[in-house]
Amino acid sequence: IVAAGAGFAAKNFEDKNLQGSQANLEGSDVSEGEENKDEVDLSDVTDYAPISIQLGYGLVEMVDNNSGGPLVNRITGIRKQVSKSLGFVVPNVRIRDDLSLEANQYRIRIGQTIVGEDEIFPDKKLAIPGDEATTKIQGIEVKDPTFGMDAIWISNFQQNEAEANGYVVVAPESVLATHLSQILSKHSAQLIGQDDVQILLDNLAQSAPSLVQSVVPKLVPLHNLTSILRTLLNERVPVSDLRCILENLAVLSSQNLSVTDTAEALRPHLSGLLVQQVAPLNQPIQVITLSGELENMLIKMVRQSGDEGLILDANLAQQLIKGISEAQQKVTSDGKTAVLVVSPAIRRQFASILKQHIEDLLVLAFTELPDNRQINVVATISSE
């Protein structure tokens, strides 16, 4: 499992190793307080940057274009890639130095909330052991920040030795950029607001003006549409097919559904976007299912609990999480991605429980599986 995970991590590091043209690099706070030390300005306590990265002083050269700093271009490439996959333009990333951090430390914020931090070494490379790595390389042993795998920071002159011994070697800017990519995808729902949605609508109106005018705001107010898109993004559903979303909202609007129920009703219409995340068109979808007895029991529990959602006995919850996690890891060890497929009656509630323990598992209703895709059931989970 570890070896296959290393291959997956390496591929992702390589996929994120993109070049761009610009990033939103704003000023340094190094000189703060040199004059008027007793004064506090509003800018000292307010920062409206949606995404920001603070760097320790040892990492500043990585964003200095005059020194050939590679990080700015990497981050721009990541923004482009994530924007394309999510379906909206991810905000600019503000990069600033922060003297309160250790020299090689970085910190990633969404708004004012710290969502990630770690340490990278600008004069070293991160070596991740691959499938055939047997020889231990000397260096600084760490866990890589994105995948949590064992890794080693090595000197540049050790790169050839590491690669010859089955390690995947990653540049420090790619380590940070890949970590950022994971965070942007994970927190995508926090990155889209009403202004962003209006931009999407204005763009769609150029090709489908009647559709936009008939749905927003006549049938669905802008703030409701924004909440619906956030709900979809929160479960890794791209919002790139806004035309499809609006067309189906036009039909659903007469049912007076809640935001959550509306998003749930939209999901089957976006099944292609969901499934393409886990399996190419020419490969079967690796599916984990629940036994009929277990699924019927969960459906009954959801109906009995009503608005409280699905409340599981602690022992049962632990047993199900363990079984699903082990089945997922078995598929991952083969270099593939598994999805859990359940009844639509319990999908949302069960996904909410699992998300707290198995973050990267996609939970689909069987109504969300495209008819033209091959299915391979890899495990069936029971309550016994």
Q: What is the predicted role of each segment?
A:
Residues 11-384:
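Membrane-embedded alpha-helical signal segments
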Residues 1-9:
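Small-residue-enriched core segments of transmembrane alpha-helices in multipass membrane transport
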